[in-house]
């Protein structure tokens, strides 16, 4: 193999550390650093390092220099040249670059792009919304009930992430970014996301576009002062590996975050060759991605590269040649700590040009990596806010920290400042003596939740319809009204549950029908207002998530959505130990539909005396009255597994679980013919309470209960429970699940149309003038129900 002549782009502590590690390799003959700093400057003829006075984004001069010096490997350090496309410039002249393309660098260059990528690839992160319009962002922020983080979309020199303490500060930050252009074009778009709480973790991962290998997990200290106080900085210190990152946690991060990220980038056409920096928050719900960078982190690099025992140059070559899987990466079992020394005043205004002096380091495991330094008149002087880092390795975190701070004492410059508590999270004695509590050992399984999402994704996607892609995992479901053919509709919403029918499902361990009930109870309430159901969202709450039960439930929801023609665009699965016991769960649904302004039902002005009431047959009890049903079953001494008294071919419970009939498509068929005046969904309250809900104040309804055959289930319930007829009428649908009001001259046509699409329809009553003391819905021939 020919000797490697490397061109390293950058001038920070990260670049000094990379150059130092590269120079340990026998493969390296020279490392040019452009522009470099006081630590990378040549210190003699034997030195492999040499600074080159070319800016990091002066691509023309960098390429010319590389060609002149026979450079055969380029390693960009900072983010700006990567985002600006440095990789492409060197690719065009045939020089391999250990860094991503401009397309892949969008993962760091655009917060909006990276968050959308996470959403597309089901990578766990904070809920978010992005905006290019200030007024829209302000309106959203005004509705937020959670603490937020506001992020400028583009690169903002590490200052574009703002964590407001109050809503007032949040509005001020938004105005500063989007209106006052504090970060210039970087703030043209913003991301507003939920503030996550927990411990942060940074993981640097080598990637060849397919294979990925991670360095030890590190923990940075962003705040300027001890105790994580003060303003944000570029990083005041770092240690690795961090004890909070257990092997199990790292396996989870690898399988749910890092590998899916590498795979997702390749699948989307911009594979990552280089370093993936993943910033994580360890929340009670599991690890969540805060950000991606596409280069070595700073000061993480200063802490983790000293732990790398393998040849860095060999690893980088394996990445650019797409054969990372062919080499082993060996990591020291030691610990590392890097303490950053900064100029007085940092991260605010600070002096440059102060002379730095160094005493001899007392331990061979201690190193100094320069950052904001330069050489002037033979002296090393300050040339930036973060001046240098003192790093040390030891057999424990405590040993590494002690050696690093001993090394800090050998560095001297005017107004030098550093934090005194680097690695305090690991050294906190309370952490060592107290039991570690996690979300999982409190009763909530994050892994189960993630597996549940994976199981139902394809089911959910099967409900796609024009206007909605039925993709889950985002902040909210989106529906495109125009794509669905609506121009200026009114939106109609409904929310409902299934009720105690769920207890029968639990008794039989049969959960695939109650999801249909959930959809039906919502969409039937929409269609009676003339609305076409467009989207549905479900809420499933339980004490401990049973994957089989929850998946079966969602299968039912999907069936219901398909019957109704609406898209399942999202939902919430809530695991609440202590609130639900013995496998119990509850469910709620919400549906949104659309109706043209002129087609809203009922149409009160169109009703008249003599209008006909048509009844559409129900499929049984549907979803109301189950508290009474269960009490009757209890009194009957039957079990839900007993043979059904009115159908010897099924169990009692199976018959009672027959789902609510969904009337949407047949009713929309006749609604669009403009012959329907109003409709009533017969739920709790029966005919006597639901039919009046569609009537104008001057009309009443008369319904003849002898015009249809009451299903056997209601006959059994009445007899087994000795239930008065008046209670039966006000509790159950008694065989009529939907009532439609039409003009007398349209009754036959309507019945024919509904029958042609599979409905059983009865002519059950008519409208009459209201009398002062009369019932709004009077049932005649009730005596027929006495003699079932």
Curated annotation (Swiss-Prot):
Subcellular location per UniProt equals: Cytoplasm, Cytosol
Q: Which cofactor does it need?
A: Mg(2+); Mn(2+)
Q: What does the record list as GO biological process?
A: 'de novo' IMP biosynthetic process; adenine biosynthetic process; purine nucleobase biosynthetic process; purine nucleotide biosynthetic process
What this protein is called in its record is Bifunctional purine biosynthetic protein ADE1
The ATP-grasp domain extends over 115-321
What family does this belong to?
In the N-terminal section; belongs to the GARS family. In the C-terminal section; belongs to the AIR synthase family.
Q: Which GO terms describe its molecular function?
A: ATP binding; metal ion binding; phosphoribosylamine-glycine ligase activity; phosphoribosylformylglycinamidine cyclo-ligase activity
Which species?
Answer: Schizosaccharomyces pombe (strain 972 / ATCC 24843) (Fission yeast)
Which keywords describe this protein according to UniProt?
ATP-binding, Cytoplasm, Ligase, Magnesium, Manganese, Metal-binding, Multifunctional enzyme, Nucleotide-binding, Purine biosynthesis
Q: Supply the Gene3D superfamilies for this chain.
A: 3.40.50.20, ATP-grasp fold, A domain (3.30.1490.20), ATP-grasp fold, B domain (3.30.470.20), Phosphoribosylglycinamide synthetase, C-terminal domain (3.90.600.10), PurM-like C-terminal domain (3.90.650.10), PurM-like, N-terminal domain (3.30.1330.10)
For whether the record's keyword set contains Secreted, the answer is no
Q: In which pathway does it act?
A: Purine metabolism; IMP biosynthesis via de novo pathway; 5-amino-1-(5-phospho-D-ribosyl)imidazole from N(2)-formyl-N(1)-(5-phospho-D-ribosyl)glycinamide: step 2/2; Purine metabolism; IMP biosynthesis via de novo pathway; N(1)-(5-phospho-D-ribosyl)glycinamide from 5-phospho-alpha-D-ribose 1-diphosphate: step 2/2
Query: What PROSITE patterns does this protein map onto?
Result: ATP_GRASP, GARS
Give the binding site residues for ATP. Answer: 141-202
Q: Which SUPFAM superfamilies match?
A: Glutathione synthetase ATP-binding domain-like (SSF56059), PreATP-grasp domain (SSF52440), PurM C-terminal domain-like (SSF56042), PurM N-terminal domain-like (SSF55326), Rudiment single hybrid motif (SSF51246)
What the record notes about the co-factor is: Binds two magnesium or manganese ions per subunit.
The annotated region (GARS) lies at: 1-430
Q: Which positions in this protein are listed as binding Mg(2+)? A: 291, 293
Q: Which InterPro entries match?
A: ATP-grasp, ATP_grasp_subdomain_1, PreATP-grasp_dom_sf, PRibGlycinamid_synth_ATP-grasp, PRibGlycinamide_synth, PRibGlycinamide_synth_C-dom, PRibGlycinamide_synth_C_sf, PRibGlycinamide_synth_CS
EC category: ligase
Catalytic activity reported: 5-phospho-beta-D-ribosylamine + glycine + ATP = N(1)-(5-phospho-beta-D-ribosyl)glycinamide + ADP + phosphate + H(+); 2-formamido-N(1)-(5-O-phospho-beta-D-ribosyl)acetamidine + ATP = 5-amino-1-(5-phospho-beta-D-ribosyl)imidazole + ADP + phosphate + H(+)
**EC number annotated for this UniProt entry:** 6.3.4.13, 6.3.3.1
């Amino acid at each position: 193999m020919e000797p490697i002549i490397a061109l390293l782009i950058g001038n920070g502590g990260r670049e000094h550390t990379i150059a130092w590690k590269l120079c340990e390799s026998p493969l390296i003959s020279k490392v040019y650093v452009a522009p470099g700093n006081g630590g990378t400057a040549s210190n003699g003829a034997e030195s492999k390092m040499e600074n080159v006075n070319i800016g990091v984004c002066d691509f023309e001069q960098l390429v010319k220099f590389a060609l002149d010096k026979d450079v055969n490997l380029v390693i960009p350090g900072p983010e700006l040249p990567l985002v600006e496309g440095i990789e492409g410039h060197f690719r065009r002249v045939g020089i391999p670059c250990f860094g991503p393309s401009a397309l892949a660098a969008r993962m760091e260059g655009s917060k909006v792009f990276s968050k959308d990528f996470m959403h597309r690839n089901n990578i766990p992160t904070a809920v978010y919304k992005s905006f290019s319009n200030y007024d829209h962002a302000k309106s959203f922020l005004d509705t937020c009930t959670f603490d937020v983080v506001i992020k400028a979309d583009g690169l903002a020199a590490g200052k574009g992430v703002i964590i407001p303490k109050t809503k007032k500060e949040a509005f001020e930050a938004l105005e500063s970014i989007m209106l006052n252009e504090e970060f210039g074009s970087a703030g043209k778009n913003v991301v507003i996301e939920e503030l996550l709480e927990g411990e942060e973790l940074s993981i640097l991962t080598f990637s060849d576009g397919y294979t990925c290998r991670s360095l030890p997990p590190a923990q940075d200290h962003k705040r300027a002062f001890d105790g994580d106080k003060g303003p944000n900085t570029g990083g005041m210190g770092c240690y690795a590996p961090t004890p909070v990152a257990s092997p199990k946690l790292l396996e989870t991060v690898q399988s749910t975050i890092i590998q899916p990220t590498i795979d997702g980038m390749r699948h989307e056409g911009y594979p990552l060759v280089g370093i993936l920096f993943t910033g994580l928050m360890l929340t009670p719900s599991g690890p969540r991605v805060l950000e991606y960078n596409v280069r070595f982190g700073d000061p993480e690099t200063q802490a983790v590269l000293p732990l790398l025992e393998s040849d860095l140059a060999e690893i980088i070559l394996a990445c650019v040649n797409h054969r990372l899987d062919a080499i082993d990466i060996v990591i020291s079992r030691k610990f590392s700590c890097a303490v950053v020394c900064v100029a007085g005043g940092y991260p605010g205004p600070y002096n440059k040009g102060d002379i730095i002096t160094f005493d001899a380091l007392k331990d061979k495991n201690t190193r100094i990596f320069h950052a904001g330094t330069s050489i002037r008149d033979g002296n090393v002087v300050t040339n930036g806010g973060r001046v240098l880092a003192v790093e040390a390795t030891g057999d424990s975190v405590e040993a590494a920290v002690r050696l690093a701070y001993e090394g800090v004492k050998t560095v001297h410059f005017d107004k030098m400042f550093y934090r005194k508590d680097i690695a305090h999270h690991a050294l906190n004695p309370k952490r060592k003596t107290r039991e570690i509590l996690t979300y999982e050992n409190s009763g909530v399984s994050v892994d189960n939740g993630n597996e549940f999402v994976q199981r139902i994704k394809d089911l959910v996607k099967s409900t796609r319809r024009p206007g909605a892609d039925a993709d889950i995992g985002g902040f909210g479901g989106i529906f495109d009204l125009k794509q669905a053919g609506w121009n200026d509709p009114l939106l109609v919403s409904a929310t409902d549950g299934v009720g105690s029918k769920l207890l029968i499902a639990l008794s039989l361990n049969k959960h695939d029908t109650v999801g249909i009930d959930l959809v039906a109870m919502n969409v039937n309430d929409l269609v009676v207002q003339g609305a076409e159901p467009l989207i549905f969202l479900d809420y499933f709450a339980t004490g401990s998530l049973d994957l089989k039960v929850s998946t079966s439930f969602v299968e039912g929801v999907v069936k219901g959505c398909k019957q109704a023609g609406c898209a399942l665009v999202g939902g919430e699965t809530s695991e609440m130990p202590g609130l639900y016991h013995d496998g119990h769960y509850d469910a709620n649904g919400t549906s949104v539909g659309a109706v043209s302004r002129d087609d809203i039902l009922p149409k009160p002005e169109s009703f008249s005396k003599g209008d006909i009431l048509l009844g559409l047959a129900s499929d049984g009890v549907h979803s109301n009255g189950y508290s009474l049903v269960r009490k009757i079953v209890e009194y009957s001494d039957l079990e839900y597994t007993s043979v059904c008294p009115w159908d010897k071919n099924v169990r009692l419970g199976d018959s009672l679980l027959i789902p609510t009939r969904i009337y949407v498509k047949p009713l929309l068929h006749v609604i669009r013919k403009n012959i329907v005046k109003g409709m009533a969904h017969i739920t709790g309250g029966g005919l006597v309470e639901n039919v009046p809900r569609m009537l104008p104040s001057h009309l009443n309804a008369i319904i003849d209960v002898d015009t249809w055959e009451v299903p056997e289930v209601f006959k059994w319930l009445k007899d087994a429970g000795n239930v008065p007829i008046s209670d039966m009428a006000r509790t159950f649908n008694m065989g009529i699940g939907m009532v439609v009001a039409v003009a007398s001259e349209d009754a036959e046509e309507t019945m024919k149309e509904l029958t042609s699409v599979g409905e059983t329809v009865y002519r059950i009553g008519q409208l009459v003038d209201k009398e002062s003391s009369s019932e709004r819905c009077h049932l005649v021939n009730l005596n027929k129900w006495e003699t079932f």
